[in-house]
Regions:
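Single conserved hydrophobic/aromatic residue that forms the stacking wall/gate
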Residues: 1-6, 10-11
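C-terminal substrate-binding/catalytic lobe of Rossmann-fold NAD(P)-dependent dehydrogenases
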Residues: 12-20, 26-189
């Protein structure tokens, strides 16, 4: 919602494509968890998607994931019962374990986010952007989509298959973002 406020108030003369929200922390965590599970290098994990909000309603998606450009088959129960909740709650786990947030992980994610925007990436990235109805998500909410970044600009991947088991979760995170937008609108001019 911070980016939505920025796009409405602070940066009205900038194109909405210049406003993005940080989902890289969640994306990095998802890649790390999967790499550990598969005993692979993080940099060899490709096409992980984080849909929606930077909250516990986010939808980590491995159904298009590859390792070194090869498709992988993962146990659906592990994805739904272990992986998704772990990514969704990882920030809380760190705070509970350490007694404070992981500022180093957040700083690293900010660096990675800016680096991807500046230099592009050959992999899909999770980037919160202002929706325009992609994947039947309501327009004008900051929603994390799979994107490809080249030359300082991003394009939302428009051909990602969403596994049917994730459909309801996408609606939950969308509804949360719609509610947040409505709360914020009360305070905007």
């Amino acid at each position: 919602h911070n980016c939505l406020v920025g796009s409405e108030m602070c940066i009205r003369d900038s194109p909405n494509t210049n406003i993005t929200s940080l989902m890289k922390l969640d994306h990095n965590r998802a890649k790390s968890i999967l790499a550990t599970k598969l005993n692979e290098k993080v940099e060899d994990i490709e096409n992980i998607v984080i849909w929606g909000n930077h909250s516990t309603t986010q939808v980590p998606d491995l159904f298009n994931c590859k390792v070194r450009s090869k498709e992988i088959n993962l146990d659906h129960s592990w994805i739904h019962e272990t992986f998704i909740p772990r990514v969704q709650k990882r920030g809380g786990e760190i705070i509970e374990f350490r007694g404070l947030s992981s500022a180093a992980s957040a700083a690293s994610a900010i660096y990675d986010h800016i680096n991807v925007l500046e230099n592009g990436s050959s992999d899909w990235e999770a980037l919160g952007v202002l929706s325009s109805g992609e994947y039947n998500i309501k327009s004008d909410i900051m929603f994390s989509f799979p994107v490809v970044v080249n030359g300082g600009s991003y394009n939302i991947k428009d051909d990602v298959n969403i596994h049917q088991s994730l459909s309801e979760s996408l609606k939950v995170t969308e509804e949360e973002l719609i509610k947040e937008r409505e709360i914020i609108k009360k305070y905007l001019p």
